[in-house]
Amino acid sequence: MYTNNSSGKEKKSKKPLICRVMNRQIPILPRFISSTIVSVKERFQLFKSLIINYQQVKPLAIALGTGLLFLMGYFFCLPRPLFSAPISQVVEDRAGELLSARIAADGQWRFPAMDSLPQVYISSLIEFEDRGFYSHQGIDPIAVFRAIFLNLSQGKIVSGGSTISMQVVRMARGNRTRNVFQKIIEAILATRLEFGYSKKKILNLYAANAPFGGNVVGLEAASWRYFGKSPALLSWAEGALLAVLPNSPSLIHPGRNRNVLLDKRNKLLNRLAARGIIDPTTCDLAKSEPLPEAPHPLPRLAPHLLDRISKEKGYLRLRSTVQSGFQANVLDVARRHHELLEFSQIHNLAIVVADVQRGEVMAYIGNAPLAGADNGEQVDIITAPRSSGSILKPFLYGLALNDAIVSPNSLLPDVPMNINGYRPENFQEGYDGLVPANEALSRSLNIPFVDLLRQYDFGRFHYQLKKLGMTTLSQAPSHYGLSLILGGAETNLWDLCGMYASMARVLRHYPAYSSRYDPADFHPLSYTPTQFLEPTNINRLDQHSNQLSAGAIWSTFEAMQEVQRPGSENQWQQFSTSRRVAWKTGTSFGFRDAWAIGVTPEYVVGVWVGNADGEGRPGLVGTLAAAPILFDVFGFLPSTSWFACPFDDMVRAEICPETGFRAGQYCSVDSLLVPKSALNSKVCPYHQLVHLDQDERYQVSAQCFQPSQMLNRPWLVFPPLEEFYYRQRHPEYAALPPLHPDCQTQSGNDSPMQLIYPRQVSRIFVPIDLDGEKSKTIFQVAHRQASVKIYWHIDQEYIGTTQTFHQFAFAPPPGKHTLTLVDENGYRLEQRFEIILKKR
């Protein structure tokens, strides 16, 4: 009979979970449900079973834990990093040759590990130290048993049986005392080393840290110290010597028993020949090579570049773009000129040579060799801010051409100038009155460029210089003012060479890029290799430059190559060795800095000469001190070309031949090739139509002559002040004829007089001499007809008359005054001024 179970299910038996250990079923944990454990006895039985089970698995747990700890200890047993000794800093040339190195902090020459080792050294090292290097995993059992046998048979330790890996471990652990215990540790660590490093890496670690005698550590340092060459150039004799030397490094010193070292080397060479690694002839020749004598000094071709890399990059080894052979030649030039400059107590100089295409440095002379610590030999002048002198003028000239403020031949004023108290002077003193802009650049005249900067605006110039790559303009434009063009700002040789190279790069690429501009062409120089990439799509380049156009740059460089070269007496073009170079010099105020920078389509060369402490010296000028170095350096460079004319950015324009401006209606006309921007430049302001009598002796006007009696002639008329100085250098200049006596006196803009001093409303500081007397002030005026008489008045009081030479020395009392000048024809000129007394 079927009976219904109220629970619905039969109760399941309570069975513990079990695991099988060593073929035994061991309960681990029963189903722990509070409803199934109903008594204290059951709880006790459960706890007891757990204790018994733990006792049974304890040995296994200990074994597993110990093994895990051992594996972890083995995995982490090598020190991190493996070697922590200080490393020498090294700079290499483009080909990997050593340029300069700095000794490590612990006084050792210890170079960074090399990427690859020469085969002569690898073969020699493995044959001498560890023939089974490539077959073992850190321990060579055969070598160990051989060492035990030899040591027992000799009764002393003659072989350690150490592999190269074990020696690397020993060096990494500080070369601890050798004993059996240390050997065991080294063996264990050597196996771990083999697991973590490739065979090549282990060889590199050994070669970089092995002792080679004295304070020389590592193969590369030893190769340079003992043989004066890169490890890649080692002979078999040299490689074998360096393989055996770490075994007895003290034998390298002169005076020691060097025959032992020679014998070791030759035995190794014989072994190499016996194994067929070298042929017998090579072996005999190698054994005939003598041991090195006194250590060679390490190359010190670019110590300042090494210092700069250390500060800027922090790299232990850096391959630069410098070419060691060319660097050595330029260093010789620096040394030779430094010896001459020392006679004038000029102690420092710097030279940069760079490739234009990539902007990569080829030579880096940060200071004169042997200048001495007292004279700042350690200062890297290439990056040191110095007064620019007039070295920035080509940039202003190019920018002014670019913005149509001038054209290449347009005239700029060269007269005494006083702009809000700023009174620039030309280096050679004197005035031209008016001078073509390109001539002002080639002669480096100061006053015309101050006036040009006034027209361009010093704030704009400040902004453009920073865009071109000048990094030293730390002050606002107002801080520099118009002095920005004459050395009022500091710059450095690195920035300047980069800026000139960028201009050359733009002009060089313009025809190659289908008359387009790549903004990436403006960039600073680099002492590390760069990757020059041609634009993939020339059509996407800019049609217009946002900095300097090709036409403006070409015109600038054309003007710069007209500079007279030092010592050449203007005949340098006749020499077959001459080359076309656009170059500029500069001299700072007080003769503290002399600059010279030259550029061709291929190279830029920059030179600075002076004293690191800023002391000025007579004769410290760009053309005398820096330019000769510039052209000596160019003499070492390969032949150079010249820039192709950027015809697509040039245009033939009608130019006034006498003033260089666009021809006006009264000008004669020349058709000249000028930058396209010149089409927007000013029309000639100096040619005007004048009315003359029939004899062309006098000027006349409709007020006094019938039009039928007048002749109309175009005439070149300069302002009286400019004319005054222009006539002194240009006797062919024809001044305006005087006004006819029957005609009324003209005034205003037609006045034939113009004050030279004082100009505008000015304050005149008059010094008081030691005896208490006031110094006299010299007033000066320019007149178109120098022979006329001029009557001088101060505050309506007549003080005298001048004729031909219109200067007057007078000592007005302190205060405000009015100077009135009247010539014999009735022309009148007034100027207010103020006298302020100042003690000397």
Where are these regions (language model features)?
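Glycine-rich, acidic and aromatic/proline-enriched surface loops and short helix-turn segments
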Residues: 170, 174, 208-215, 232, ...
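Soluble, non-transmembrane domains of envelope/secretory-pathway proteins that act on or interact
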Residues: 52, 278, 420, 536-542, ...
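Juxtamembrane regions of bacterial inner-membrane/periplasmic proteins
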Residues: 2-4, 9, 14-343, 356-362, ...
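A penicillin-recognizing enzyme superfamily signal
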Residues: 320-343, 351-355, 364-367, 372-381, ...
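Acidic/histidine-enriched alpha-helical segments
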Residues: 140-146, 185, 220, 259-261, ...
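Short pre-catalytic segments that frame enzyme active sites
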Residues: 85, 90, 97-110, 221, ...
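Conserved catalytic neighborhood of penicillin-recognizing serine enzymes
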Residues: 153-178, 232, 295-310, 406-461, ...
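Residue-level preference for non-acidic, small/hydrophobic
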Residues: 96, 125, 168, 202, ...
